[in-house]
Amino acid sequence: MNYFKLYRTPHGHVIQSSNSDKSIFHQASSWDDFINQENLFDACASAFAHGTEVNFGDIHLLHPVDQQEIWAAGVTYLRSKVARMEESKDSGGDTFYDKVYSAPRPEIFYKGNSHRAVGHGGKVRIRKDSAWNVPEPELTLFINSQGKLAGYTIGNDMSSRDIEGENPLYLPQAKVYDGAAGIGPCLLVTDQALAPETVIDMRIFRDGIEVFQGDTQISQMKRTHAELVEFLTREMSFAKGTYLMTGTCVVPDYPFTLQSGDRIEIQIEPIGTLIQIVA
């Protein structure tokens, strides 16, 4: 598979290629215009060939979200269904998750925008009114303004499990708040779909000690990427494109909860690693 890594910076884009060790700076158009070109892979190839080489270590990275919305799909893995049923059984909400896992229509909800997004090296937040907070590592799709899957990045769907478990209708409060949408570090643009064997790996460190590690393959998803894209774009248009987190099954078990200062590392190759600190 050939690919380009597209990084957003304050002054333009930095592009890396699977066939080179160079980092190339490109400043020909806005982020929104560039990523919504009809053939983004070819656009990256052209920009890489005609740009200026830079030292990647000197680059200040921004999250890959400008005017895009961020959406998320839930209960797309079996383990996610089981976990959601367990956390919500006391409220009687467990049947909701059982039904949505097998239903024709997936769960899709609004996650945030550029204002609420946190990029690589940034600080994600946990709610002050929640006692059970976890990160959820998710392969995230970029869907362009034509409604086509055009790239991939890494998502960290910060979640307040006790709030969601209390009542499924509280999901927007459990999932959508300032600093709850981790995303980055780049937009991966490929010449073919990611392999089913692609691994999502998450590690959490506290005071320098690893306190959680979990991983899965995207082949464990019940729903296809095409299916999720079709449902999201069925009655909605996105003039600047949109991001769609695709769900997770790698979540720390109760009673683990995040604390301020925890370091979250989510790796999905060949995208890279998204590293964030809990504020």
Which residue stretches match the model-derived regions?
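A short, compositionally biased
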Residues: M1-Y3, R8-G12, E136-P137, A193-I200, ...
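Generic recognition of flexible, low-complexity loop/linker segments
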Residues: F4, K128-D129, P252-Y254
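Active-site microenvironments in enzyme catalytic cores
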Residues: D42-G208, E227
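Short acidic-glycine loop/turn motifs at beta-strand connectors
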Residues: P10-H11, S17-K22, I143-K148, F205-G208, ...
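Catalytic-pocket segment enriched in acidic/His residues
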Residues: R161-A279
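Generic N-terminal segment detector
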Residues: M1-I70, E227, Q276-A279
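Short clusters of small/polar residues that mark proteolytic maturation junctions
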Residues: N19, I154, D215-T216
